[in-house]
Amino acid sequence: MARFVVVALLVLLSLSGLEAIQRAPKIQVYSRHPAENGKPNFLNCYVSGFHPSDIEVDLLKNGKKIEKVEHSDLSFSKDWSFYLLYYTEFTPNEKDEYACRVSHVTLSTPKTVKWDRNM
């Protein structure tokens, strides 16, 4: 009887993990300092509140992937959702556009958020 109860509990526990909650990422794009044309700065893309942890994040300049990008370690919040910070050095000017593109299982297509120099 005890063996049956243990097996039943193991089956229930394994089935409960099949329906893990998926959460779409929140994406925030901002510069470390207020933007000034010609003055070096850092472009940040903070991605938070997502689950599961598998995610792809790219910083873009004029729609093209920036290669020299660093990021924080993957971390999780009290609610077990994940967050990351991607960042790179850049020098803003009038003509270049910057953005952050995120791909995640909760998104049917990658989501791109543009940097607003006035934020």
UniProtKB/Swiss-Prot annotation:
Q: What is its main location?
A: secreted
Instruction: Please verify whether the record's keywords include Electron transport.
Output: no
Query: What is the annotated localization of this protein?
Result: Secreted
Q: What SMART domains does its record include?
A: IGc1 (SM00407)
Gene Ontology CC annotations of this record: extracellular region; MHC class I protein complex
Hey, what's the signal peptide range on this chain?
A: 1-20
Identify one Pfam family in the record. Answer: C1-set
**What biological processes does GO assign it?**
antigen processing and presentation of peptide antigen via MHC class I; immune response
Domain Ig-like C1-type: where?
25-114
Listed as disulfide-bonded, the cysteine pairs are C45-C100
Entry keywords, A to Z = Disulfide bond, Immunity, Immunoglobulin domain, MHC I, Secreted, Signal
Question: Self-association or partners: how does it assemble?
Answer: Heterodimer of an alpha chain and a beta chain. Beta-2-microglobulin is the beta-chain of major histocompatibility complex class I molecules.
* Record-stated family: Belongs to the beta-2-microglobulin family.
| Protein task | Component of the class I major histocompatibility complex (MHC). Involved in the presentation of peptide antigens to the immune system.
Name it. Answer: Beta-2-microglobulin
| Provenance organism | Aotus azarae (Azara's night monkey)
